[in-house]
Regions:
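Glycine-rich flavin
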Residues: 63-82, 231-239
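Glycine-rich loop at the start of a catalytic domain that most often binds anionic cofactors/ligands
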Residues: 58
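Flavin (primarily FAD) cofactor-binding/catalytic cores of flavoenzymes
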Residues: 2-47, 51-53, 82-383
């Protein structure tokens, strides 16, 4: 259990101000603001250690953004500001951030249900329960690994991993590897695997950031990209409202590992995997690949079925406006992809969104009793 676990625990009859569910960068950033507002809060995280969401990813992963953009509110990221931190450095930073500000994080807590009893929210995790006036969903959108139905028809001899399970090539069987998915994770994992295995990557290209990734880009290009991601490609601008749905459907452009890098490493590139025939993957052009391993870099499904509140559209989409769930006063969300901007699930994005959400929560807290709705807080001029 985390060293911060002594701060707050479930107590019968005690009503907290806020329960934040999720102790990654989004939950920690917002928690920092809420503690500064002198709120009685707890941050619940399913992992055994703060930062494990990063720590448990593939070994060679580095952040796409330079360190000067990777800090959270109140604590700059240490070290080389133009360098690109490893996933372990990012994990350790988050752990240090929670300790530095004394954030009341409880680790190893798997929330089963969020509901309501009377005026308060109830958060259940096994035999434990918390009551609160506010709940923040900070679990992101990467809940359930998504793989196609036909994956189950691959031959038993084919080793299958989702990108969330991949750490390094020692997990793989001898023989060719097929990486399914041509996004950033697919490209990076394919390049990693190609050092020891014959590798093919399958999928539709998502485009590329047309600059070479490195220190020069960190100095001159990423400040422009960051500004656009924070202030232009948002639902608050006409261009953002047009572009964001397309970006959400199409996927992010390749940032560090480009098609030319894959070609230089000898990685074969093919079209989409559309089926399985005789236990082998079938490509859109009808060709069949004989491989010993498949790594599914096919993303995740959102799963908020444990939130037992009238906060969703018919298709299960959370109804929120910049993190505020107006249909359920006191319910908020942060760190979700495209929640407000293209950067909403990134480190720079959660820093911006956490400050905004904390202002909204403060406005609701101080609103007159007759104006308790989130709409009333919005009309009070919170921006």
């Amino acid at each position: 259990m985390d060293e911060n676990n002594h701060h707050t625990h479930s107590e019968p009859g005690r009503v907290l101000d806020t329960v934040v569910i999720g102790g990654g960068q989004a939950g920690l950033a917002l928690g920092h603001h809420l503690v500064r507002q002198h709120r009685d809060i707890v941050i619940l995280d399913a992992y055994d250690r703060v930062g494990d969401a990063w720590r448990l990813r593939w070994d060679s992963l580095r952040l796409f953004t330079p360190a000067k953009f990777d800090g959270l509110p109140g604590l700059p990221f240490p070290g080389d500001r133009l360098g690109f931190p490893t996933k372990d450095e990012q994990a350790d930073y988050l752990e240090a951030y929670a300790a530095h500000f004394g954030l009341p994080v409880e680790t190893g807590v798997h929330v089963d249900r969020v509901g309501r009893i009377g005026a308060h929210f109830v958060v259940d995790a096994g035999a434990r329960q918390w009551e609160a006036r506010n709940v923040v969903l900070a679990t992101g959108g990467c809940h359930e690994p998504r793989v196609p139905e036909f994956a189950g028809r691959l031959a038993a001899s084919v080793r299958q991993l989702h990108s969330s399970e991949y750490r390094n090539a020692t997990q793989l069987r001898p023989g060719p590897v097929l990486v399914v998915g041509m996004g950033n994770s697919g490209a990076e994992i394919a390049l990693d695997v190609s050092r020891s295995h014959a590798t093919t990557v399958a999928g539709t290209p998502t485009g590329e950031l047309p600059v070479r990734h490195g220190r020069a880009a960190a100095r001159f290009v990423f400040p422009v990209v960051r500004f656009a991601g924070l202030h232009v490609l948002t639902f608050g601008t006409p261009i953002g409202r047009r572009a964001l749905p397309k970006l959400a459907h199409h996927g992010d452009p390749l940032i560090r590992t480009k098609a030319a890098d894959l070609d230089a490493a000898g990685v074969a590139r093919v079209g989409r995997v559309v089926d399985v025939r005789d236990g082998k993957p079938v490509i859109a052009d009808g060709s069949v690949l004989d491989v010993a391993n498949v790594i599914w870099c096919t993303g995740f499904r959102d799963d908020l079925t444990w939130v037992d509140l009238p906060a969703f559209d018919d298709d299960g989409t959370l109804r929120q406006r910049r993190g505020v769930v107006e249909s359920v006063p006191g319910l908020y969300a942060i760190g979700r992809e495209f929640m407000y901007a293209v950067t909403s699930a990134t480190l720079p994005g959660v820093s911006r969104d956490s400050a905004y959400l904390a202002r909204r929560m403060r406005a609701r807290r101080t609103a007159p009793a007759s104006a308790t709705s989130e709409t009333a807080a919005s009309s009070a001029g919170v921006r």
